[in-house]
């Protein structure tokens, strides 16, 4: 059990390879062999990373970098992921990819994901439970799908 934090800002090491970046996720673990095995499992799962494992991270697209950041956190085998603004700065196709990855981690790997997201629509579509904040205070709370259809939320955040 553990918690991993995925930063909002680009946090890959650009001159290190994709594989080296992944292994940094397990740097603080005592069991380095376990980190190597988990990194290999992740590389097998994500073809985009596997195909670029020996390339420097600076050649990755924004979406691929975000995938690498998420994957690096997974090397620690956390049960909880704190994810800060996963869609920020990404093209729409990569936003979809990132949320598909997060949904897979939630549903298939049983990860608990606590998400902060400026794209209210994507965040609420993803959320089991959502909190809408106004000036740092909880304005509305509820199930994600209910908030998505709440006209007050729509007026405030979704342009509805």
Feature-to-residue mapping (PLM):
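ABC-type ATPase nucleotide-binding domains, specifically the catalytic core motifs of the NBD
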Residues: 16-37, 45-47, 142, 158-160
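Conserved ABC ATPase signature
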Residues: 56-60
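Conserved catalytic motifs of ABC-family nucleotide-binding domains
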Residues: 77
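Catalytic Walker B motif of ABC-type/P-loop ATPase nucleotide-binding domains
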Residues: 81-85
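ABC ATPase C-loop
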Residues: 73-74
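Helical segment within the ABC ATPase nucleotide-binding domain
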Residues: 96-110
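Hydrophobic anchor residue at the start of the ABC signature
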Residues: 70
């Amino acid at each position: 059990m553990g918690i991993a934090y995925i930063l909002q800002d680009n946090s890959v090491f650009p001159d290190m390879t994709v594989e080296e970046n992944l292994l940094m996720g397990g740097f603080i673990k005592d069991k380095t062999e376990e980190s190597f095995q988990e990194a290999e499992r992740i590389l097998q799962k994500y073809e985009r990373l596997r195909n670029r494992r020996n390339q420097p991270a600076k050649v990755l697209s924004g979406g691929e970098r975000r995938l690498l950041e998420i994957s690096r956190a997974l090397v620690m085998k956390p049960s909880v992921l704190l994810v800060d603004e996963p869609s920020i700065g990404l093209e729409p196709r990569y936003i979809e990819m990132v949320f598909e990855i997060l949904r897979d981690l939630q549903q298939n790997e049983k990860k608990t994901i606590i998400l902060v997201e400026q794209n209210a629509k994507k965040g609420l579509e993803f959320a089991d439970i959502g909190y809408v904040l106004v000036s740092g205070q909880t304005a509305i709370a509820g199930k994600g799908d209910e908030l998505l259809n709440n006209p007050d939320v729509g007026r405030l955040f979704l342009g509805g």
